[in-house]
Curated annotation (Swiss-Prot):
Protein name in UniProt: Ig kappa chain V-VI region NQ2-6.1
Region named Framework-3: 56-87
Region listing for Complementarity-determining-2, in residue ranges: 49-55
Residues in coiled coil: none
Annotated PROSITE patterns: IG_LIKE (PS50835)
UniProt-annotated stretches for the region Framework-1: 1-23
Length: 108
């Protein structure tokens, strides 16, 4: 089983500030996915296959990383970006879907 550890657990940023959060895997993974969730809403896919932007996601979001170390960056924080962000990986053998515990991003 692969454990995903997200850091920090909670962070705050001012409008216009660059934000970076990380996701560390206990074993090497091929790809990472990132989701944004706001209270009362379903998770929204932001990044797939580590660095590809999902449809309709603003270009201020980007993903990077490899092996056991991955990150999500917001180049310029906006008020609507306040949310909880989750990383997720898919292992084909054995078939397993794993999520991190989340990073809560608050507006400062």
């Amino acid at each position: 089983q692969i454990l995903l550890t997200q850091s920090p657990a909670i962070m705050s940023a001012s409008p216009g500030q660059k934000v970076t959060m990380t996701c560390s895997a206990s074993s090497s993974v091929s790809y990472m996915y990132w989701y944004q969730q706001k209270p009362g809403s379903s998770p929204r896919l932001l990044i797939y296959d580590t660095s590809n932007l999902a449809s309709g996601v603003p270009v201020r979001f980007s993903g990077s990383g490899s092996a056991t170390s991955y990150s999500l960056t917001i180049t310029r924080m906006q008020a609507e970006d306040a949310a909880t962000y989750y990383c997720q990986q898919w292992s084909s053998y054995p078939p397993m879907l794993t999520f991190g515990a989340g990073t809560k991003l608050e507006l400062k």
